[in-house]
UniProtKB/Swiss-Prot annotation:
Annotated tissue distribution: Expressed in salivary glands.
The protein, known as: Tabkunin 2
UniProt GO molecular function: serine-type endopeptidase inhibitor activity; toxin activity
Signal peptide positions on this chain: 1-20
BPTI/Kunitz inhibitor domain span: 25-75
Length: 76
């Protein structure tokens, strides 16, 4: 019985760590302070989805991905 309980605890911890998102994903969308128009993707933590936005080209934050696939792999 103790072994079964230990296995359950280990499994629970592994699931918890595997489902933890990168802190980058909690950053807000930041279009940057310049005036270029690069199509990018960011993770919207309110909707739980990656969404497109236009990046100005400088500034911003790390919640800024070149492709939808890259955003989903990191955050979704």
């Amino acid at each position: 019985m103790k072994v079964l309980s230990l296995i359950f605890v280990i499994f629970s911890v592994l699931v918890l760590f595997a489902s933890a998102k990168d802190p980058v994903c909690d950053q807000p969308k930041a279009v940057g302070r310049c005036f270029a128009a690069f199509p990018k993707f960011y993770y919207n933590s309110s909707s739980g989805q990656c969404q497109a936005f236009i990046y100005g080209g400088c500034g911003g934050n790390e919640n800024n991905f070149n492709t939808l696939e890259e955003c989903n792999a990191k955050c979704a």
